[in-house]
């Protein structure tokens, strides 16, 4: 069994406002992220993502940063982090992100019309984050080459499914009876 699958099966589950949330080093930074797990994930992303002609990797703060940094280092593709803080820089584009458990204003810098981007995130659950990011990137005029999330939590409404965008995932899971259940160990293509 691969490390990602095993680590998800061992992940503790918490309930937050009626939402069953798994606590995992990729999505939460706790427990500690082992280098071998991160390496496995990065290799899987590089194999699954369409990287040809990608100018920039775009990821939301905070939990996409460690994954995207590692992919950037392995591919030499520059990294853009979508921040929750406004800087007021020229070309800064705001977006509103709503998930199953939070709402945030976020800001994109350093993505221009005509840029070819890979959107990369840790978890696809409600689709609120990725849908908002893809819409904002489209408004900027960027070409979204591919969208990849490491983990997809199935079993609920997913905004991305009703949008023109789709995401590849490395593994699909659900939470049943207080435990993570592997739905598809290969994720979505």
From Swiss-Prot:
Enzyme Commission code(s) on record: 2.4.2.-
UniProt cross-references to InterPro entries, sorted A to Z: HGPRTase-like, PRibTrfase_dom, PRTase-like, Pur/Pyrimidine_PRTase
One record GO biological process: purine ribonucleoside salvage
Residues crossing the lipid bilayer are none
What GO molecular function annotation could you give as one example from this UniProt entry?
transferase activity
Signal peptide residues on this chain, from the entry's feature table: none
Keyword vocabulary terms for this entry? Purine salvage, Transferase
- Entry function: May catalyze a purine salvage reaction, the substrate is unknown.
Family listed: Belongs to the purine/pyrimidine phosphoribosyltransferase family. Archaeal HPRT subfamily.
Name it: HGPRTase-like protein
Source organism of the structure: Natronomonas pharaonis (strain ATCC 35678 / DSM 2160 / CIP 103997 / JCM 8858 / NBRC 14720 / NCIMB 2260 / Gabara) (Halobacterium pharaonis)
């Amino acid at each position: 069994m691969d490390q990602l699958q095993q680590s998800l099966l061992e992940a503790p589950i918490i309930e937050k406002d009626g939402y069953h949330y798994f606590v995992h080093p990729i999505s939460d930074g706790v427990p500690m992220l082992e280098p071998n797990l991160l390496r496995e994930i990065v290799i899987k992303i590089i194999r699954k993502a369409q990287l040809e002609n990608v100018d920039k990797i775009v990821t939301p703060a905070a939990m996409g940063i460690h994954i995207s940094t590692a992919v950037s280092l392995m591919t030499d593709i520059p990294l853009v982090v979508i921040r929750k803080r406004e800087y007021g820089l020229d070309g800064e584009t705001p977006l509103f992100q709503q998930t199953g458990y939070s709402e945030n204003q976020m800001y994109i810098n350093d993505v221009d019309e005509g840029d070819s981007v890979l959107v990369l995130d840790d978890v696809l659950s409600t689709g609120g984050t990725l849908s908002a990011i893809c819409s904002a990137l489209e408004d900027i005029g960027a070409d979204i080459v591919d969208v990849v999330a490491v983990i997809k939590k199935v079993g609920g409404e997913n905004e991305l499914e009703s949008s023109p965008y789709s995401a590849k995932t490395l593994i699909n899971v659900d939470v049943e009876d207080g435990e993570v259940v592997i739905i598809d160990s290969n994720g979505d293509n």
